């Protein structure tokens, strides 16, 4: 069965990378959201089961991390991170925050565990061999603007750009890359639809971490993040203050594309309410299972959309 799944996936990815004058460029967008992204992990595993592939993949924060496993063809890897490893205090804990200044153990998650010889390593060769483009933002802490990383910025056993895209302000220290510091990509571009369209995507499949119809309110805890960041990173504070505006603009644009038949979206039902830092494996498993179920139930709709 594994061989059959792999064959279908390789055939689809080869087709995705083959080009052609009449063919539309189809992009996959995976929203961030910390542990809420267990939902998109389930959807992506269902995509792998059916050999569903895309020309271009854009992910934000944990959504970018999910995409790396998906593009490497490592089914169930994301589920293990959300549903098994999450109980390890090195993954997520107040102990981490006290010891390192980061609630999430980004070096542990995307370094120690992910590197060759780690507990659950990424198949780096498979990721690099995949013809699909991969783009994900991180926020330059000094400017508050998005920098878009690609697969070319990743090196074997060096996944700092992924860590940077997941470094939530206040909850995590910024990640240093070549002398510059970066925070979570969601601060500057939570839904990089504009980037996707600029790069040539004409059709979009979007996986959200929040319920259908969600619009973002102004950032909460403003006094906390302003006090923590304003002296060193005032432009990051400014980006946080306006994050909801760019998010809602992108969301409304996706909805317009959906009405025009150029976008297809998946979103959790809202029945399972979790926070970004939830650590309950049973809740994570339920959210993941819902993602698998939703994707399977809508597989014909998805395939019809991709073939139009």
Place the predicted regions along the sequence by residue:
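Patatin-like phospholipase
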Residues: 1-60, 68-308
């Amino acid at each position: 069965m594994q061989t059959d799944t792999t064959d279908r996936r390789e055939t689809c990815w080869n087709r995705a990378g083959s080009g052609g004058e009449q063919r539309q460029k189809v992009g996959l967008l995976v929203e961030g959201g910390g542990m809420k992204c267990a939902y998109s992990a389930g959807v992506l595993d269902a995509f792998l089961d059916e050999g569903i592939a895309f020309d271009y993949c854009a992910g934000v924060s944990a959504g970018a991390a999910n995409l790396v496993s998906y593009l490497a063809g490592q089914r169930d890897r994301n589920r293990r991170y959300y549903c098994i490893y999450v109980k390890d205090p090195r993954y997520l804990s107040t102990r981490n925050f006290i010891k390192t200044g980061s609630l999430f153990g980004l070096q542990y998650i995307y370094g120690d565990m992910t590197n060759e010889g780690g507990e659950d390593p990424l198949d780096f060769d498979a990721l690099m061999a995949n013809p699909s483009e991969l783009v994900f933002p991180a926020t330059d802490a000094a400017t508050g603007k998005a920098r878009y990383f690609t697969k070319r910025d990743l090196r074997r056993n060096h996944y700092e750009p992924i860590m940077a895209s997941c470094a939530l302000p206040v909850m995590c220290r910024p990640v240093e890359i070549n002398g510059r510091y970066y925070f979570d990509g969601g601060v500057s571009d939570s839904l990089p639809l504009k980037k996707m369209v600029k790069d040539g995507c004409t059709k979009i499949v979007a996986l959200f971490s929040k319920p259908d119809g969600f619009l973002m309110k102004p950032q909460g805890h403003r006094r906390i993040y302003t006090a923590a960041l304003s002296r060193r990173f005032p432009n990051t504070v400014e980006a946080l203050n306006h994050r909801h505006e760019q998010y809602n603009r992108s969301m409304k644009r996706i909805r317009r594309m959906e009405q025009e038949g150029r976008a297809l979206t998946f979103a959790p039902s809202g029945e399972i309410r979790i926070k970004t830092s939830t650590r309950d494996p049973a809740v994570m498993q339920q959210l993941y299972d819902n993602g698998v179920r939703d994707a399977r139930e809508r597989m014909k709709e998805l395939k019809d959309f991709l073939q139009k």
